[in-house]
Swiss-Prot record:
[4Fe-4S] cluster binds at residues 408, 411, 416. Belongs to the ThiC family. Zn(2+) binds at residues 264, 328. Its cofactor is [4Fe-4S] cluster. The gene is thiC. Residues 427-440 have a biased composition (Basic and acidic residues). Binds 1 [4Fe-4S] cluster per subunit. The cluster is coordinated with 3 cysteines and an exchangeable S-adenosyl-L-methionine. Pathway: Cofactor biosynthesis; thiamine diphosphate biosynthesis. The keyword Transmembrane does not apply. It comes from Natronomonas pharaonis (strain ATCC 35678 / DSM 2160 / CIP 103997 / JCM 8858 / NBRC 14720 / NCIMB 2260 / Gabara) (Halobacterium pharaonis). This is Phosphomethylpyrimidine synthase. It catalyses: 5-amino-1-(5-phospho-beta-D-ribosyl)imidazole + S-adenosyl-L-methionine = 4-amino-2-methyl-5-(phosphooxymethyl)pyrimidine + CO + 5'-deoxyadenosine + formate + L-methionine + 3 H(+). Catalyzes the synthesis of the hydroxymethylpyrimidine phosphate (HMP-P) moiety of thiamine from aminoimidazole ribotide (AIR) in a radical S-adenosyl-L-methionine (SAM)-dependent reaction. Residues 427-477 are annotated as: Disordered.
Length: 477
């Protein structure tokens, strides 16, 4: 079957491109050209029937990925579906199922059956569970797992094909070594076998499988820095050069490509990292994990990384992989998913505003106008997380009459600056009254930059419990 890239190169605007154009408020021909040039991807496996197509590229609204998945000690299929529902509810544009234990096939196929957003995987995780030791992996097993997951409907796969044997000595002086799970597994395999990375050696065979199902390849950064001390080092950039080569090889097979990036990077190096990737990989969409801008805040790494993610997106990164408060500490639950997504939706939206995306600031202006008008219900309705906003307000002023009040508990009646400003404008002749001017219904913004958060067509998920906090229920009353 033909891939989105092959269709685009042939001049065909597909149904998926039409849907993307609608969601992005862009011309369908522009979408087609971006895909044809490899500057954007539409991850859309032919077998993912529940998918509502979306696009990832620097010329479009910044997207956010949420990692879900279990580990051997924790979480089963039902809990993972609840995480999926939570992720979509709070605005994930894609999800990655990173499960490493339990019934992997059931978890994966259930996620794909219910998910309206693209589902990504890291196939080497399943491959490792099918052998006694990682050193027992074979190229044939890796190809078999990739093909099986493609048949199941996976939309994009992370393949750490750029970690080469000659790169490994470059990590010797690092502080935290190789922190990518896939990268470390392959490094050990190469060391024990004295052979080259099998994902690199069999990359053309892998691309043939991916093209058959239109699976987008996400070229993994197996040598990404896991600490500020290791950022922008020789190992990271040697792998990046290989990823540039692999990008062009995948394109030759008609496979859509995005490239993954760090990691942990000081703030002043982030823009240079993004620009380098865009140059080396010929503009293929950059998909970054954070990056974290400091290593001192375990428990708050959704914040340390969202700071870096904002800068990365401002510089041209196309998709941000969220980090939850549990990063480096444990497996996230549904509430951690909520917190991580809030941080990253803020990062993505802030970058889109900074980059002047059409209509992106309209949402901000509408909230500000509702705030100035003391229209509390409208503020809650427009908020990124309506339940959280209403809950915080009602903790101190719970009665309904306070929804009409011209103050909150921060300043009280006498010291509310906006109330004082309004009174001054009404009393004198020197200042005119202020009026609301923003019409979100006519905004040129992409869907992800307009409320409500979580705008995917998700009818199938209605059958799955969503473990949202009680304050969400209150906000909907």
């Amino acid at each position: 079957m033909t891939t989105q890239l092959q269709h685009a190169r042939g001049g065909t605007v597909t149904d998926a491109m039409e849907r993307v154009a609608e969601r992005e408020n862009r011309d369908a021909e522009f979408v087609r050209q971006q895909v044809a040039d490899g500057q954007a991807v539409i991850p859309a496996n032919h077998g993912h029937d529940a998918l509502d197509p979306m696009i990832i590229g620097r010329e479009f609204a910044t997207k956010v990925n949420a990692n879900i998945g279990n580990s051997e000690p924790a979480s089963g299929p039902e809990a993972e579906l609840q995480k999926l529902h939570t992720a979509v509810h709070y605005g994930a544009d894609t999800v990655m199922d990173l499960s490493t234990g339990g019934d992997l096939d059931t978890i994966r196929t259930e996620n794909i059956a219910y998910s309206p957003v693209p589902v990504g995987t890291v196939p080497i995780y399943e491959a490792v569970t099918r052998v006694d030791d990682a050193s027992d992996l074979t190229p044939e097993l890796l190809l078999d797992v990739v093909e099986k997951q493609a048949e199941q409907g996976v939309d994009y796969m992370t393949l750490h094909a750029g970690v080469l044997a000659e790169h490994l000595p470059l990590t010797d002086g690092r502080t935290t070594g190789i922190v990518s799970r896939g990268g470390s597994i392959l490094a050990r395999w190469m060391e024990e076998h004295g052979e080259q990375n099998p994902l690199y050696e069999r990359f053309d065979d892998l691309c043939e499988i991916l093209a058959a199902y239109d699976v987008t390849v996400s070229l993994g950064d197996g040598l990404r820095p896991g600490s500020l001390a290791d950022a922008s080092d020789a190992a990271q950039f040697a792998e990046l050069d290989t990823l540039g080569e692999l990008t062009r090889r995948a394109w030759d097979h008609g496979v859509q490509v995005m490239v993954e990036g760090p990691g942990h990077v000081p703030m002043d190096e982030i823009a240079d990292n993004v620009e380098r990737q865009q140059d080396v990989c010929d503009g293929a969409p950059f998909y970054v994990l954070g990056p974290l801008v400091t290593d001192v805040a375990p428990g708050y790494d959704h914040i340390t990384s969202a700071i870096g993610a904002t800068e990365a997106a401002r510089a041209g990164a196309a998709m941000l992989c969220y980090v939850t408060p549990k990063e480096h500490l444990g497996l996230p639950d549904a509430e951690d998913v909520r917190d991580g997504l809030a941080a990253y939706r803020i990062a993505a939206h802030s970058a889109d505003v900074a980059n002047g995306r059409p209509g992106a600031r309209d949402w901000d202006d509408a909230v500000s106008e509702a705030r100035y008008a003391f229209d509390w219900r409208r503020q809650f309705e427009l908020a990124l997380d309506p339940g959280r906003a209403r809950n915080y307000h009602d903790q101190t002023l719970p009665e309904d009459n306070y929804k009409e009040a011209r103050f909150c508990s921060m300043c009280g009646v006498e010291f509310c600056s906006m109330r004082i400003d309004q009174d001054a404008r009404e009393a004198g002749d020197g200042m005119d009254g202020l009026e609301s001017r923003t019409d979100l219904d006519s905004s040129a913004a992409a869907a992800v930059n307009r409320p409500p958060t979580g705008v995917h067509r998700a009818e199938k998920l209605d059958d799955i419990p969503c473990p949202v906090a009680e304050d969400d229920v209150a906000a909907d009353d």
